[in-house]
C-alpha cells in the first residue's frame, strides 16, 4: 500500500501549476485518494529563466523539460506534467508520455488591441508572438504586418499588449481557458486557416518506462482519443525532425474508430507552404502521422528545409 505521497513534477508558471492541479484532481477522483497523497513539486527550467529570446535561438523545446526529466530518471519524481506541445519528439532513454488528459480546445486565440480580428488589423500593425509557426501563419495571411518576438508568461504577454508594445498577440486558447481567461480573446482562429501546433491543448504525463506502479496509477485518467490524436501529431513532427526551430502545424481529430490528420509546413516568411491530409483507423495513429510527415517532406523537396535550423 502506498504510504508516501506521489510526487508530481511541474514548472512553476500559473499555467503549468493549473495543469498539475488538474492532473492531481483527476487522479484523486479516479482512485478515491485524498489530496495529501499527492505532492506538487515545482522546478524552475532553463526555458522559464531565459525570457528575452526566442526558443529557436536558445535550444528549442527541451529547455522546458530537462530539469523535470532528470528528477524523473533519478526517482525524485514519480511523474511529470507537461504541455504536450512543449515536448521534444525524442524523449530521454527510459521515459515516455504514458497518459494524456482529455484535450482542451486546440485552437489559437487572437487578442487584438487595435482591431478585434487578425484580418482587420491596419496595414503595418505590430503582432507579437514567440512561436515560429504563428509568425509564419501570420505572414502567410497578412504579409504586410510587422511580426515581433513576444515571450514570457501569459500575464506578461497580455501586459506587454496593454502597454502598447504590440497591436495584437496570439496565444493557445486552451491555456487561456485553464487560467480562467476565456473572455480575453477577441477572435478564435479557425484551424483550417490557422492550424495549431501538434499536441496543442493536450496535457501530457511523463513517467518511467517499466514503472508498473505509475502505469496503474495513470491508466484511468488516460483519454484514449487524445492519446491517439497526439500520437499521430507527434509522429508527424518526428518525421519532419520538428522542434521550435521549424514552422510546423498539424492536428488530428478522432471520430469513432477513425482518425483524420491535417498537416502543414511553411517557410518562416509564410510565403511557401505544403499541406497534407490523411485518414485511417485510430489504431494506426503512429503510422499515419509518420506517413503524413514523409509525404509532405517528399512534396516539399530537400531544398525547402535548408536554412531552417
Swiss-Prot record:
Q: What are the protein's UniProt keywords?
A: Porphyrin biosynthesis, Transferase
- What Pfam families is this protein classified in? Porphobil_deam (PF01379), Porphobil_deamC (PF03900)
State the needed cofactors, names only.
dipyrromethane
Q: Please, which domain of life does this record's source organism belong to?
A: Bacteria
Q: Which residues carry this modification: S-(dipyrrolylmethanemethyl)cysteine?
A: 244
Pathway(s) per entry: Porphyrin-containing compound metabolism; protoporphyrin-IX biosynthesis; coproporphyrinogen-III from 5-aminolevulinate: step 2/4
**A GO term (biological process) for this protein?**
protoporphyrinogen IX biosynthetic process
For the keyword Acetylation, the answer is no
Q: Does the keyword tRNA-binding apply?
A: no
This protein's GO cellular component annotations are: cytoplasm
Its assembly, as annotated, is: Monomer.
Extract the NCBIfam families matched here: hemC
Its UniProt miscellaneous note says: The porphobilinogen subunits are added to the dipyrromethane group.
Membership in a protein family = Belongs to the HMBS family.
Q: What is this protein called?
A: Porphobilinogen deaminase
What gene, per UniProt, encodes this protein? Answer: hemC
Amino acid at each position: 500500500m502506498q504510504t508516501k505521497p506521489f510526487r508530481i513534477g511541474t514548472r512553476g508558471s500559473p499555467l503549468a501549476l493549473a495543469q498539475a492541479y488538474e492532473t492531481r484532481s483527476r487522479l484523486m477522483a479516479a482512485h478515491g485518494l485524498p489530496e495529501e497523497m499527492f505532492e506538487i513539486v515545482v522546478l524552475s527550467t532553463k526555458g522559464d529563466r531565459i525570457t528575452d529570446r526566442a526558443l529557436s535561438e536558445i535550444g528549442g523545446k527541451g529547455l522546458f523539460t530537462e530539469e523535470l526529466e532528470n528528477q524523473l530518471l533519478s526517482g525524485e519524481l514519480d511523474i511529470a506534467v507537461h504541455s504536450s506541445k512543449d515536448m521534444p519528439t525524442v524523449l530521454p532513454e527510459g521515459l515516455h508520455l504514458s497518459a494524456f488528459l482529455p484535450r482542451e480546445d486546440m485552437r489559437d486565440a487572437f487578442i487584438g488591441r487595435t482591431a478585434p480580428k487578425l484580418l482587420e488589423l491596419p496595414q503595418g500593425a505590430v503582432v507579437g508572438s514567440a512561436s515560429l509557426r504563428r509568425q509564419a501563419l501570420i505572414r502567410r495571411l497578412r504579409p504586410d504586418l510587422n511580426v515581433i518576438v513576444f515571450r514570457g508568461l501569459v500575464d506578461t504577454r497580455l501586459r506587454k499588449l496593454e502597454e502598447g508594445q504590440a497591436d495584437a498577440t496570439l496565444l493557445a486558447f486552451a491555456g487561456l481557458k485553464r487560467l480562467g481567461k476565456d473572455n480575453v480573446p477577441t477572435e478564435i482562429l479557425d484551424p483550417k486557416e490557422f492550424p495549431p501546433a501538434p499536441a496543442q491543448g493536450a496535457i501530457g504525463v511523463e513517467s518511467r518506462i517499466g514503472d508498473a506502479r505509475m502505469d496503474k496509477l495513470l491508466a484511468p485518467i488516460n483519454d484514449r482519443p487524445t492519446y491517439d490524436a497526439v500520437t499521430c501529431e507527434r509522429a508527424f513532427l518526428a518525421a519532419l525532425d520538428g522542434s521550435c526551430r521549424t514552422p510546423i502545424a498539424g492536428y488530428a481529430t478522432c471520430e469513432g474508430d477513425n482518425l483524420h490528420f491535417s498537416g502543414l509546413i511553411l517557410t518562416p516568411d509564410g510565403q511557401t507552404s505544403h499541406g497534407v491530409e490523411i485518414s485511417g483507423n485510430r489504431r494506426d495513429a503512429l503510422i499515419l502521422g509518420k506517413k503524413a510527415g514523409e509525404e509532405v517532406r517528399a512534396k516539399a523537396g530537400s531544398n525547402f528545409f535548408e536554412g531552417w535550423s
